[in-house]
Amino acid sequence: MDKTRIPVIVGTGQVTDTTSKPEEGRSPLQLMHDAVKLAAADSGAQDQGAALLRGLDSVTVIRLFADTLPRFASPFGKLANAPWSIAQRVGAANATDLVQGGDSQVVILARACERIAQGERQAARVGGG
């Protein structure tokens, strides 16, 4: 392994909204975006991590449970491409996007780390909703 390409987690963020009335609550996409901003700020990078976010070349989102099975579908529809939406919101214009499902959170993190270690990626965002 190239010692200059050791992947590290530089920031984490989690957002929940258990107190808002349903009609006033944030959408799953807004909650994800808020978590991304918290993770960027947690990184300690300048400008609350804005440059770090713009430099993302990979954005992955774990598929929402409500989008998995029709019987759990939200009456408000589903997110067609949450990773793309997050990439656009944070200015990561060159990021590839991927929706991943199942119990694969750690697999996705491992893949992101592997791609960084191999030089295929510079920075990656992994998250769910």
Regions found by a protein language model. Name each.
Residues 98-103:
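Short beta->alpha junction loops
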Residues 30, 104-107:
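Glycine-rich anion/phosphate-binding loops
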Residues 1-97, 113-121, 125-129:
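Conserved "HGTGT" condensation-loop signature of ketosynthase/thiolase-family condensing enzymes
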Residues 106-114:
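Conserved phosphate-binding catalytic cores of ATP/NTP-utilizing and phosphoryl-transfer enzymes
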